[in-house]
Amino acid sequence: MSLPLGIERCKVDTNGRFKLPVALKKGLATEDSRFVIRRSINAPCLELWTHAGFEQEVEFLNQELNRYNREDVKMLRKLMRCNVVELDTNDRILIPAEQKECLKSSKEIVLQSLGKFIEIWDYDTYTEIDNDATDYAEKVDQRLGSLRREAGSSDRSDT
């Protein structure tokens, strides 16, 4: 399965469209021009999924959530609040009006690949979160270092 990799800055035109960069489009490895956009539950951004990738996500949600449990149904409603969009002939995607407000009034966005999907950030918001003062290396070591050591595949030598 091909995955999009990378980070790209894009301009948003006056109609709310942006051009999907060639590098990210190639990484999506799909002939289908349909995509799904939804608000992220983890950050103030949008998520761009391939249509097939989102179908897999829905299948997973349907297996894991109980439609007769009120809390699960509320969660499902939030996760399914999305729009299907299509690439136009110029490889542009129109950001739906109800989701455009998540991007403030920015004329510039950042597309950040997260493997299964691409985050769509307002440029200013992305710059703020990307420059936060947390110790990134320490957090990675705490979260992933112990997993590598448990698996016996640590490349690091403790000195």
Positions of PLM-derived features:
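A positional/architectural concept
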Residues: 2-43
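Acidic/histidine-enriched, glycine/proline-rich intrinsically disordered or flexible terminal extensions
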Residues: 134-159
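Short, charged/polar, Gly/Pro-enriched secondary-structure boundary elements
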Residues: 55-57, 126-130
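Short, structured motif recognition centered on aromatic/hydrophobic residues
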Residues: 16-20, 91-95, 118-120
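A short beta-strand-loop micro-motif that forms or neighbors metal/cofactor-
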Residues: 29-45, 82, 101-126
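Short, solvent-exposed interaction modules
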Residues: 56, 62-100
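A low-complexity, Ser/Thr/Gly/Pro-enriched, surface-exposed linker/loop concept
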Residues: 43-69, 142
